[in-house]
């Protein structure tokens, strides 16, 4: 469905909940505002009694994961167009070319992307350019899009502070994304 500045947040939310994608043709900043409004609606607590009270922690976790999946599916329904050069052909469209090139590679034809996904690309690009401060390293890491967050402190601090076996001289960081865990281990003298 085509959506523009006349589409209300309530109507957009109903459509998104039904699985209807909305291709935005209005003002880009209004699309961002609509995404925020959709998120607010998706984050509302269910009515009392609407969900079965979980009997175990595992059930509570499963309910949480299902709710997060539904939220993600709803927010992914708002789409924006990109031209062949990763330009957003909407009024007040943000410059996303460098972010898209870094994450997606060269584009040769027009395409469509979820606004939420596009904003994630832009956020990752800003991290790549400016870096993310990792206190355990006393330095910045410049991660690529789609890798382990270098600022997930609970993991980084654990690797930085946990006692290591005395004979440990070599470790493998399997699945290295940003390399932050390998850098923390290297700082501790591990090869």
Model regions and ranges:
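Class I SAM-dependent transferase core
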Residues: 116-165
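Conserved SAM/SAH cofactor-binding pocket of Class I
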Residues: 152-191
